[in-house]
Amino acid sequence: MRSLALLCAVLALSDGITRLPLERGKKLREILREKGLLHHFLQHHRYDIGTKFPHAFPDVLTVVTEPLLNTLDMEYYGTISIGTPPQDFTVVFDTGSSNLWVPSVSCTSPACQSHQMFNPSQSSTYKSTGQNLSIHYGTGDMEGTVGCDTVTVASLMDTNQLFGLSTSEPGQFFVYVKFDGILGLGYPSLAADGITPVFDNMVNESLLEQNLFSVYLSREPMGSMVVFGGIDESYFTGSINWIPVSYQGYWQISMDSIIVNKQEIACSSGCQAIIDTGTSLVAGPASDINDIQSAVGANQNTYGEYSVNCSHILAMPDVVFVIGGIQYPVPALAYTEQNGQGTCMSSFQNSSADLWILGDVFIRVYYSIFDRANNRVGLAKAI
């Protein structure tokens, strides 16, 4: 993983955009399964992707806090550095949240001790704010403080960035996650304590050619990319379809319907969807997800997950998301995944939220552009 830092130290190329490579790692779900701990985790921690998005509807928004983050299915990571001289951290680039945080050397939790920890005393540019920060998880609260320092993302140097330093991380299971922290790429309205997100500081400091970023996710361990300040046409074919952001908090859009076997099966009266790089699955209301699972032939196992017969995948139907009148089919090869034990799992997940979360399963099929200048999302068929 740390060898990735060399790749991340790329210069902004002549086309005026900056690329940061991502690595696809093993999900915590699979690590816990291999260690025989998944059943225990699911018994003791209510896992609900929908709790990550408490503010998806502005009419019920009262207090803006950092959204809940579920780490069970995060799988794409990149390397950034903080401080002078730089200290490297592996982070999830998460369009479903807006704060940056990493572990602090002041944290004695096992989860911190098993990851890279930021040492403020070793950075000549670090400034303490005296401010506290609490980030809520399905497994408990992450407590920390807020510091200010230089944050470098690929060749982009943000010299005055507020970020969270965790002093306590909840739950023994955080020991096993493959990333050190989170870098949120959502709108500023989601950020805890009014902290300006990293992307907004990049824009404010005129570091980007354009006020947008784009994401390509590969199924392979290497090859994924976040592109800051532009669009890389080598990652997609055909034209870009643009969809307006319906609520400027998450990267939230309006979806028309969901079709399986030419039948409208969910979201029949229209619904809201969030394009989220920090969730690997596609999640939606439980009744709709159950209908999709039934339509594609998935069966529930003892963990509450849904599995399919691996030999049937090529015959399984596409799940088609209709957005702005355009159909976006996701084939069975994209929405199923072998779990390493000879079983193929469905990547559709129940959620308590009355909205859809189009995570990495969807983004792997459609190159995604997050255009803040025009408050819109662009989708194009990924290579």
From Swiss-Prot:
E.C. no: 3.4.23.-
GO BP term, pick one: proteolysis
Record-linked Gene3D superfamilies: 6.10.140.60, Acid Proteases (2.40.70.10)
Domain of life: Eukaryota
Enzyme's top EC category: hydrolase
UniProt-listed InterPro entries: Aspartic_peptidase_A1, Aspartic_peptidase_AS, Aspartic_peptidase_N, Pepsin_A, PEPTIDASE_A1, Peptidase_aspartic_dom_sf
CDD domains: pepsin_A (cd05478)
Protein's recorded name: Embryonic pepsinogen
Organism: Gallus gallus (Chicken)
